[in-house]
Amino acid sequence: MFGYASNETDNYMPLSLDLSHLLLIELAAIRREGKEMTYLRPDSKSQVTIEYNEDNVPVRVHTIVISTQHDEFIVPTEQTHEAQMVADEKMLSIIFEDVKNILIPRVIAKLPERLKALFDDKLILHVNPTGKFVIGGPHGDTGLTGRKIIVDTYGGKGGHGGGAFSGKDPSKVDRSAAYAARHIAKNLVAAGVSDEVL
């Protein structure tokens, strides 16, 4: 079992995971508000890649990947493969521009100044890179328990013992020992003993 903490963020989580969560929280808020990006559906995922310097200090947000479920809001007038491809490309283009011009600025606005400075014009943005994403949630993925164990912890930074947390009571060390190790790591970083603990 592993516990991890870092002083990169106020909640002692890795910056890449924290930004990824914030992107999805804000995307869900936009969907619930229902004023912009009205085609959004509930399923989504994100990944953020951070560039670090030699001293392991974040220097910039390198890449953001956002995949978001959406309505099929552009329907081709003809029932041909070519017409469907054109409609799909238009949808994906609109979604890309909305993520770039609506979602990303809203997320940046909520960040502390030191993190806002990590966003630059070299940011690589991938939106729905595998194409349209109309079918999602349990309809698109069956068997949701224990499938995303890395995102349940530290997003690839730090370690993971391999066991899922879902569906386990506190007597199972996969869950309880990982929580205890995180508690220890977080308190060591919060006390200033170290910048990062695993």
Where are these regions (language model features)?
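Conserved phosphate/anionic-ligand binding catalytic regions in large, soluble enzymes, centered on
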Residues: 1-9, 134-159, 163
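Conserved structured core elements
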Residues: 17, 93, 97, 145-148, ...
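Glycine-rich loops and low-complexity Gly/Arg-rich segments
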Residues: 25-27, 73-75, 149-153, 175-178
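Structural beta-strand/beta-sheet cores of well-ordered domains, especially the beta-sheet scaffolds
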Residues: 44-46, 62-64, 121-125, 129-131, ...
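Short, functional N-terminal and low-complexity linear motifs
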Residues: 52-55, 148-153, 197-198
